[in-house]
Amino acid sequence: MKHSASESKPLSSGLAIYRRLLRYGFPYWRSFCVAVVAMIAYAAITPFFAKLIQPLIDGSFIDNDPTVLRQVSLMLIGLSVLRGIAGFLSEYCSGSVGRRVIADLRRDIFDQLLNLPCSFYDNASGGQLLSKLLYNTEQVSASLQQGIITCIREGFTVIGLMALMVYQNPVLSLVFLVLGPVLGLSVRFVSKRFRRLSMRIQESMGKVSHVTQEVIDAQRIVKVFNGKDYEAAKFATENDRNQKRQMKLIATDALGGGVIHLISVAGVAGILYVVSLDSVRQTITPGSLMAFIAAMAMMLSPIRRLSQVVSVMQRGIAAGDSIFAMLDLPRERDRGRISLKRARGSIEYRHVSLVYDDRHGAAVDDVSLVIPAGKTVALVGQSGSGKTSLVRLLPRLYEATAGEILIDGHDIRELTLESLRRQIAYVGQEVTLFNDTVASNIAYGCLDRVGLDAVREAARAANALDFIETLPQGFDTLVGQQGIVLSGGQRQRIAIARALLKNAPILILDEATSALDAESERYVQQALEVLMQNRTTLVIAHRLSTIQNADQICVMRGGRIIECGTHAQLMAARGGYADLYAMQFGYSSVPEAVAVHAVRR
């Protein structure tokens, strides 16, 4: 995925992204406020530890007052308890906000994935999307949680210690304050580099996830084709690229932290040099000097943590930029106002065209077709002729570039997506099953509306009940990812049972029997005949033997319908359909195929 645009954005865009991330924490403002108050309390208590050094030295050792030592001891215990409580509250409450933000972000990302159009997934990487959902959200949480804790708690600690230093000796404090602009420039440089590197790391993490997911999904192909070495090399390349980018980030973090620490130590050294001057040394007591030096020493650690939090915050901003870029993508258009309860099933395509990409020609080119309710229409043609593209337009998986499609006289764009898709059932060549029970897969989409009796009846009608009852847990058997524990024919019958249970008036069959053996095809074909009864059916077929009884057969070529008719009419016409028939059944010529066909009739 490309990030060049985001990498060149000004710093203000990073602030805008961070503000948008912070809005995810607004619903949990009570916990956030408790965390902020606890952080400020923690920071306010810290300077008192340095301040106590002055009475400890001046009172106990200079003035020889033992009561001061006892008082300081009690105060140290009290301050430690208070700071411990404040530290716990700040960590717990900010952690609570951070985890809730992650949950909300993941919910929004998943909801967006469910509502993005199919065209988005045509060019999207599954690994990249998974990386956004898992890795990027963790980066955002770390940015919010650690970033806020460090900025508020350590920031106020530095302010408190600096105030103590100014109170103890304003002149010496000026030496330390002079280094402020130098620290600011260092942090600015480091933050810009962190953001660039973080974006590249997130991109490479997505590629690592993508390669891994591909190997898991295609592990049988990898084994059969001895692709282990190739896949290992591909993974090693992406993994090594990610590791190198991580090392650049670590180097930048270490170098930036070291430089900032060096600048801070230089300030301390400068102050010690100034204190060595007689004119200054005579104006300060030993206790006051030690309190001042203690405040400086205690300030170094918060300053270092503040410099290191830049990396966390920039990673979070880069992750947020990537997440929001996806969340801002347009969703499927659902502007229809008509909710169709149950269609009769008549379908009409009027001069419909579809262009996936302007660089290529039309996948569907000015197609007009009328399908009466309850009729079966088969679409045939060579691969790439536009059959599947034409059918994909019906449930609005893709939007037609031109023309209109009507169901029962209603333009499908005027129907709500939910009611449109409620009218359509689908059975394809590649059956999609979820890693759930057989019953849940059959009842998918209507789990809350049907009982087991309805599921059993659908399975019986789909010729699936016999094999389901032989499974270890029957309908409660887990089918595995993509139904891996079932055969191809069994998966197909589960898909048919799912379509039967949906009981939609329109049915799409996409090469539903092309990958089956003869026995499985017989069972599936019987189930399909039951499924097609009293339904408007669109059949995409390569095997012409399966669609000869269709009410109408349409031959497609180059995105257009070149001829339509019954099997007998098209054979008699000796056109494109007869060519396909002769080729598929091994006849030497169309006339021979037509002659044999006439004799068989």
UniProtKB/Swiss-Prot annotation:
Catalytic activity: ATP + H2O + lipid A-core oligosaccharideSide 1 = ADP + phosphate + lipid A-core oligosaccharideSide 2
Quaternary organization: Homodimer.
Entry keyword set: ATP-binding, Cell inner membrane, Cell membrane, Lipid transport, Membrane, Nucleotide-binding, Translocase, Transmembrane, Transmembrane helix, Transport
EC top class named in words: translocase
ABC transmembrane type-1 domain sequence ranges: 34-315
Sequence similarity: Belongs to the ABC transporter superfamily. Lipid exporter (TC 3.A.1.106) family.
Localization terms from the record: Cell inner membrane
Membrane topology: Multi-pass membrane protein
Gene that this polypeptide is encoded by: msbA
Species of the source: Methylococcus capsulatus (strain ATCC 33009 / NCIMB 11132 / Bath)
UniProt cross-references to PROSITE patterns, sorted A to Z: ABC_TM1F, ABC_TRANSPORTER_1, ABC_TRANSPORTER_2, MSBA
Limits of the ABC transporter domain: 347-583
Record's keyword annotation contains DNA-binding: no
Residues involved in ATP binding: 381-388
Entry remark concerning the domains of this protein: In MsbA the ATP-binding domain (NBD) and the transmembrane domain (TMD) are fused.
GO cellular component, one term: plasma membrane
GO molecular function, one term: ATP binding
Taxonomic classification: Bacteria, Pseudomonadati, Pseudomonadota, Gammaproteobacteria, Methylococcales
InterPro entries referenced in this protein's UniProt entry, alphabetically: AAA+_ATPase (IPR003593), ABC1_TM_dom (IPR011527), ABC1_TM_sf (IPR036640), ABC_transporter-like_ATP-bd (IPR003439), ABC_transporter-like_CS (IPR017871), ABC_transpr_lipidA (IPR011917), P-loop_NTPase (IPR027417), Type_1_exporter (IPR039421)
General function of this protein: Involved in lipopolysaccharide (LPS) biosynthesis. Translocates lipid A-core from the inner to the outer leaflet of the inner membrane. Transmembrane domains (TMD) form a pore in the inner membrane and the ATP-binding domain (NBD) is responsible for energy generation.
Transmembrane residue ranges: 33-53, 72-92, 158-178, 255-275, 283-303
Protein name: ATP-dependent lipid A-core flippase
Main location: membrane
Keyword Cytoplasm among UniProt keywords: no
EC number: 7.5.2.6
